[in-house]
């Protein structure tokens, strides 16, 4: 399939494997699109390499930086987003709140967006989480929050905040994105 680049670390590939196999649960027959830019190219490359181990229906797109979060990607990128079922966005600026992302989601794409992701945070930061454990923990917290009107968060280091939930919508964003139209950020 794909020959690995020498500068991609094992830690980056391990995290990419988690994104591809656990978070997105990519299947062999799926079309996968990885969108990156010059500032996040190392991360995009590692995601491409790992996805290429699962499917040969993969495309890596390097787009110019958008200069600010929420700015629409170039038209060719937006067009190709609508044609893929699995989209990984590893760019400096967020594409989460763009019409291109919304349209792709509406048409059934599942999308993982990682705005601002860099090599260090990809290798050693939150992306290295155990997503199966995280999914269970967040699901349990969602049940708790749905039943409470008042929430208090405190810690030994001095955190002490309380707020009313007011019947707000509970979003269980646990990093797992395995259904059409789903997005994880």
Name each model feature, range by range.
Residues 3-185:
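Active-site bordering "gate/hinge" segments
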């Amino acid at each position: 399939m794909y020959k690995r680049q020498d500068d991609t670390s094992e830690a980056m590939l391990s995290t990419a494997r988690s994104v591809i196999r656990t978070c997105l649960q990519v299947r062999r027959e799926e079309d996968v699109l990885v969108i990156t830019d010059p500032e996040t190219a190392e991360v995009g490359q590692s995601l491409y390499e790992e996805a290429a181990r699962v499917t040969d229906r993969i495309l890596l797109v390097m787009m110019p930086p958008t200069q600010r979060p929420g700015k629409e990607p170039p038209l060719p990128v937006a067009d190709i987003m609508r044609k893929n079922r699995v989209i990984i966005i590893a760019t400096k600026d967020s594409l989460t709140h763009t019409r291109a992302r919304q349209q792709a989601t509406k048409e059934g794409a599942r999308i993982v967006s990682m705005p601002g992701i860099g090599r260090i945070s990809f290798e050693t930061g939150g992306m290295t989480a155990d997503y199966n454990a995280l999914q269970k923990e967040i699901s349990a917290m969602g049940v708790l929050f749905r039943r409470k009107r008042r929430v208090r968060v405190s810690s030994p280091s001095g955190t002490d905040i309380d707020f009313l939930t007011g019947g707000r919508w509970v979003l269980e964003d646990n990093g797992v994105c395995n259904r059409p139209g789903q997005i994880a950020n």
